[in-house]
Amino acid sequence: MEEFQGYLEIDGYQQHDFLYPLIFREYIYALAHGLNRSILLDNVGYDNKSSLLIIKRLISRMYQQNHLIISANYYKQNKFFGYNKNLYSQIISEGFAVIVEIPFSLRSVSSLEATEKEIIKSYNLRSLHSLFPFLEDKFPHLNYVSDVLIPYPIHLEILVQTLRYWVKDSSSLHLLRLFLHEYYNWNSLITPNKFIFSKSNQRLFLLLYNSHVCEYESILLFLRNQSSHLPLTSYGIFFEKIHFYEKIKYPGDEVFSNDFMVSILWFFKDPFMHYVRYQGKSILASKDTPLMMNKWKYYLVNLWQCHYYVWSQPGRIYINQLSKHSLYFLGYFASMQPNLSVVRSQMLENSFIMDNAMKKLDTLVPIIPLIVSLAKVKFCNALGHPISKSTWTDSSDFDIIDRFVRICRNISHYYSGSSRKKSLYRIKYILRLSCVKTLARKHKSTVRTFLKRLGSKLLEEFFTEEELIRSLIFPRTSYSLKKFYRGRIWYFDIFCINDLVNHE
């Protein structure tokens, strides 16, 4: 945000809510180039060609009635100063994404100044693993769960209208509307694989999609307030990647629940609804009866049909019992398992044996989807048998080992919260043997002779850092320490899902 303050003269634009002139500022695209360095198109002369004159000519031609610049036949025969259509759209979308983010960034700065100390303490809330302690704490007391996919908008005008609540500059919205209509086939952008995870123009599409999800959740929260007998505590709308600090200030938004201080009012707390979301997938869980869950299901269907013009059938939203249903979320299979224990109580000369049954959240590694992911990137075949990575044989031995070790450690790090660690041994075995086969293929040797030459040094590289520390600190002779060694650990430094983990 300091870069915005230094280069963009934000105060003047903020006062008049007028962002459109910034599209003609050359340093906007220089700033966008730095923010999008990792996802820019591979163009050698990009830095030299993205001048202010080119941008002005490009935008002026977009408003021409003959639209020569977007004609398909024109592109086949001519190129405007050596550019192609993808580069045009890339340049404008990068600059426009930075401009539209200015109002959101200003609000984030105001929240940052007010809650700077709280943000430092609550930094771990950004981790994906921070959701699982919440699930462990709340889900054993709930009865029903519904796994809901947030529908994608079927028309781009819905996204443009959503931005009107945040960006009051109509000229910028008109430019966005024209840009999306003329430069893209919108039917190819609303599909899940292309809309969110598109490599080109990723920043702009993430901004549009996040605004769509933000409005959806604000309406959902309003419906939840109307269905409750008592008002909620204060909350803030969490706008992914932009309004994160509002989440820190009001920690009851993205994962929210009804927490009332007075125990006498427990009866009025009956509509006990919890909501969790990551990307386009959300979970609704309730302590109430199936009737209340069905009521929420029709809330969602009517919301999608009436507000977002998305046709959806109630039968596609399933309501399941937590005790009988396995939930797939954030790369884990989560289910409720009974934890039986026997308690012996003695009073004077009489003793009683009581069975104590408690429910706990069981998180498992989806071993079959993981093997399928490894097979797609050529670490093993469809049956899970390790194979050599032929495309890496041109690299040095150190680079090959380092790549395999990093993949193995990242997977082990992410699945450290699994209830059963044994299922990860097969994944580690595939990666280790695939690494050995790749090195043996590079040196034109056999796996056996290569292992004899390296010995156990190669296998030690695949131990994760936490495994090495535990093996040095905790002896495995004690049952209690062994149980701790095998326990679940949630790390608060995981901010994204690895491609091998994301099987959706």
UniProtKB/Swiss-Prot annotation:
Gene Ontology molecular function terms on file: RNA binding
Name used for this protein in its record: Maturase K
Subcellular location: Plastid, Chloroplast
PANTHER family: MATURASE K (PTHR34811:SF1)
Originating species: Aruncus dioicus (Goat's beard)
CC annotations in GO: chloroplast
Keyword set, alphabetical order: Chloroplast, mRNA processing, Plastid, RNA-binding, tRNA processing
Lineage start: Eukaryota, Viridiplantae, Streptophyta, Embryophyta, Tracheophyta
Main subcellular localisation: plastid
GO BP terms in the entry: mRNA processing; RNA splicing; tRNA processing
Cleavable signal peptide: none
Family assignment from sequence similarity: Belongs to the intron maturase 2 family. MatK subfamily.
Primary role: Usually encoded in the trnK tRNA gene intron. Probably assists in splicing its own and other chloroplast group II introns.
Keyword Ribosomal protein in record: no
